[in-house]
């Protein structure tokens, strides 16, 4: 659903009481619900086994997203395969997203651990760290079994 933009969420008196609250208004549906569900299902595969962004998975939640990797243009034409922009845009819980975030890294450094920077192995882990903190701050309830850190490290 596309929401109408709002600048004010609420009017609050000096003593902290809420005088008036402004609820979100839906402007229109961007996609049919069935189409949106198909898109979320397809984007969940990106963070599943065999996907390009397993490193973006947050324990206790299904994450859906899309990776991006682009070579930067050379001044004289063509593309420089050593200079790239990588990204990951993700949402969680995937079934009913409460949080959406895009992480973009411009010319990430090549390292022994990441000799070929891509959206999934550079921006994915950053999304994960942000999403873990946001889940706590937003008090999001896990939608999947929570894996212990030991079980996660053993499964990798």
Regions found by a protein language model. Give the residues of each.
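Active-site beta-strand/loop architecture of penicillin-binding DD-peptidases
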Residues: 1-27, 43, 47-139
């Amino acid at each position: 659903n596309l929401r109408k933009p709002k600048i004010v969420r609420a009017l609050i008196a000096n003593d902290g009481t809420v005088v008036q609250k402004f609820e979100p208004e839906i402007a229109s549906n961007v996609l049919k619900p069935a189409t949106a569900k198909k898109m979320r299902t397809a984007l969940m595969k990106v963070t599943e086994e065999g996907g390009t962004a397993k490193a973006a998975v947050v324990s206790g939640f299904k994450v859906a997203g899309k990776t991006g990797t682009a070579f930067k243009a050379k001044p004289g034409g063509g593309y420089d395969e050593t200079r790239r922009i990588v990204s990951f845009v993700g949402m969680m819980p995937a079934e009913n997203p409460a949080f959406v975030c895009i992480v973009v890294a411009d010319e990430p450094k090549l390292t022994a651990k990441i000799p070929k920077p891509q959206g999934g192995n550079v921006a994915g882990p950053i999304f994960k760290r942000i999403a873990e903190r946001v889940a706590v701050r937003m008090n999001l309830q896990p939608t999947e079994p929570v894996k212990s850190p030991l079980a996660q490290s053993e499964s990798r």
